[in-house]
From Swiss-Prot:
Source organism phylogeny: Bacteria, Pseudomonadati, Campylobacterota, Epsilonproteobacteria, Campylobacterales
Organism, as annotated: Campylobacter fetus subsp. fetus (strain 82-40)
Gene that encodes the chain: ispG
Role summary: Converts 2C-methyl-D-erythritol 2,4-cyclodiphosphate (ME-2,4cPP) into 1-hydroxy-2-methyl-2-(E)-butenyl 4-diphosphate.
Keywords, in A-Z order: 4Fe-4S, Iron, Iron-sulfur, Isoprene biosynthesis, Metal-binding, Oxidoreductase
HAMAP family recorded: IspG (MF_00159)
Protein name as catalogued: 4-hydroxy-3-methylbut-2-en-1-yl diphosphate synthase (flavodoxin)
Length: 356
């Protein structure tokens, strides 16, 4: 697919837009003034594969805490500002980017103060439009609609451009999947600033995964989007796991295993479900892009194996292990997974040797 060309901005050491890879973001839910807990969550996100983290600034104690957090964070920090523009001005001295909500940050004079502060340190601003908190002028005219979100974004982009500020990212979030997608689609032709994708208030893991896969995955397949967050209530690592899976399954991230497995049926004569769980757990650290298949019977296993780097075809009490469609071992069922994992390791080593 071809991505829409966008301006590239820099959040800390992470490039967003242009030809940069789609980055994954998340947000701490600890009180930012609780430096220890906030850093604990940031480190969890870092090891889960997050690229950028956002922290809420709710009061002056959060400003003090965030400065310390920034000193120790392994990830670039975006300050999330609502209502009080002076907090944005204060934290702009040390954070990597500012997110403002145009629905509650205040008028032109306040936005100007934030822009001037960000200019001094050359840090970007994300215009974070949210359907649940549109400016009164747009909600009164358009309601909490796609058009209202798009008009809010265009208006605020114009304000920043009038102040000669163009290090901008834009998000248009709704809890409604269709409205989220349409808002990004309708705004895209009118601006070349990078888009931060997300469905807001998406819920717990099950519903958030479905909503995000549809909305974010759909937009990414249309070439729309430069950075993203999967919002899941209270589940830090799951946000990153789901986001990375969306990127992999849309073909935008070539990292880790693409595991193909059958849904099982009446022909199954082995414990395929347990085998899959073991494979997922034992291979979650792998970064090398590999296609592997774990199939329960021979009906589709041979065909899938032809397109896989490494494959298992289970039978009744035994099965096959294959590399690039060729059988390398016929083993008893309890031996298959270990041999399969060994072949994956060997495939990775062989690639490294060939590339070295």
């Amino acid at each position: 697919m071809q991505r829409y060309p966008t301006k590239q901005i820099l959040v800390g050491n992470v490039k967003i837009g242009g030809d940069a890879p789609i980055s994954v973001q998340s947000m701490t839910f600890a009180k930012t003034r609780d430096v220890k807990e906030c850093l604990e969550q940031i480190n969890r996100l870092y090891f889960a594969g997050c690229d950028i983290v956002r922290c809420a600034v709710f009061n002056k104690e959060d400003i003090v805490g965030l400065e310390q957090v920034k000193k120790e964070s392994p990830l670039p920090i975006v300050a999330d500002i609502h209502f009080n523009y002076s907090y944005a001005v204060a934290v702009s001295k040390f954070v990597d980017a500012i997110r403002i909500n145009p629905g509650n940050i205040g008028g032109k004079d306040r936005i100007k103060a934030v822009v001037e502060a960000c200019k001094e340190r050359n840090i970007p601003i994300r215009i974070g439009v949210n359907s649940g908190s549109l400016e009164e002028q747009f909600e009164n005219k358009y309601g909490r609609s796609v058009k209202g979100m798009v008009q809010s974004a265009l208006y605020n982009i114009g304000l920043l451009e009038e102040l000669e500020f163009t290090d901008i990212a834009v998000s248009l979030k709704s809890s409604d999947v269709y409205n989220t997608m349409q808002a990004y689609r309708e705004l895209r032709p009118f601006t070349s600033y990078p888009f931060h994708l997300g469905v807001t208030e998406a819920g717990t893991t099950f519903h958030a995964t479905i909503k995000s896969a549809i909305a974010l995955g759909g937009l990414l397949l249309e070439g729309i989007g430069d950075t993203m967050r999967v919002s899941i209530t209270g589940e830090l690592e799951e946000e990153i796991k789901v986001a990375r899976a969306i990127l992999q399954d849309t073909g935008l991230q070539k990292s880790g295993l693409n595991i193909i497995s059958c849904p099982t049926c009446g022909r199954l004569q082995s414990d395929l479900v347990s085998a899959i769980k073991i494979v997922e757990e034992k291979t979650k650290h792998i970064k090398e892009p590999l296609n592997v298949s774990v199939m329960g019977c021979v009906v589709n296993a041979i065909g899938e194996a032809k397109g896989a780097d490494v494959a298992i075809a289970f039978g009744k009490g035994n099965g096959l292990v294959m590399r690039h469609g060729e059988v390398v071992a016929r083993l008893k069922e309890h031996e298959l997974v270990d041999r399969f994992l060994s072949e994956i390791d060997d495939e990775i080593k062989q690639r490294a040797s060939n590339n070295g």
